């Protein structure tokens, strides 16, 4: 029998006026083994997923999949107006202080704005403490897994100005993890592995053919996603970063 291929998963906040956020809930979400997709939405959520290659968004966002293969194409956190299209002023967003825990596996976690606690076990994990996206290449590796192209933080609002980042606590297990904590006073602990840790904003790009890490940079982007804003607008963080054994790259910001 044929199996349907998922095209996209998107959170939508609809209001009568089309421009303001609805009241949100503090959700408790638990899943078992398997490759899960979870969008917590706004509010103080508690999300626990077991082993598997999971995708978790602590607040609002979208996940799209490649049309033919069904592999992951893009994962992004975003705060949308009632029409579901353009970002609104971040002052209107009731963000959540989320608690996110996962089992072993290659997880992607975009915690979103707020003071989040993220705990991830062993695996080649990608964790963004605040806003950002993971863009995949249009190819798979030898195991049939989607290959990353870019992982980046981004701060979006209607006025191209910075959003206050959260004071996040991020802990990962053994494995080659990628962590972009984002703005705010963050506490980051990674275990053994060839880890990449950015204490504030930045991006990592990957080689097209091999999928190996190509470029790592710390930067602060406007809401177009490419031009650097004046540093006086950035509310940077006093971060605490601890790593285990391995060939780590750390840019504290």
What are these regions (language model features)?
Residues 24-26, 35, 44, 95-97, ...:
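Surface-exposed or flexible loop/turn and strand-edge residues in extracellular/cell-surface modules
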């Amino acid at each position: 029998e044929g199996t349907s291929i998922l095209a996209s998963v998107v959170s939508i906040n609809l209001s009568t006026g089309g421009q303001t956020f609805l009241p949100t809930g503090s959700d408790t979400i638990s899943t078992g083994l398997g490759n899960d997709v979870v969008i917590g939405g706004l509010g103080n959520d508690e999300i626990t997923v077991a082993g598997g290659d999971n995708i978790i968004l602590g607040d609002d966002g979208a996940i799209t999949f490649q049309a033919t293969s069904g592999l992951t194409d893009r994962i992004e956190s975003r705060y949308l107006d009632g029409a579901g299209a353009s970002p609104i002023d971040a002052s209107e967003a009731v963000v959540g202080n989320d608690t996110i825990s996962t089992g072993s596996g290659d997880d992607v976690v975009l915690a979103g704005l707020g003071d989040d606690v993220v705990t991830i076990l062993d695996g080649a994990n990608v964790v963004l403490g605040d806003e950002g996206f993971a863009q995949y290449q249009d190819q798979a590796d030898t195991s049939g897994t989607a290959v990353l192209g870019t992982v980046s933080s981004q701060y979006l609002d209607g006025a191209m100005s910075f959003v206050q980042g959260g004071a996040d606590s991020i802990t990962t297990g053994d494995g080659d993890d990628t962590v972009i904590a984002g703005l705010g006073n963050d506490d980051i602990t990674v275990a053994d592995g060839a880890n990449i840790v950015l204490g504030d904003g930045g991006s990592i790009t990957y080689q097209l053919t091999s999928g190996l890490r190509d470029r790592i940079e710390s930067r602060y982007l406007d809401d177009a996603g490419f031009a650097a804003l004046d540093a006086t607008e950035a509310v940077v963080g006093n971060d605490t970063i601890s790593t285990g054994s391995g060939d780590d790259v750390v840019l504290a910001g």
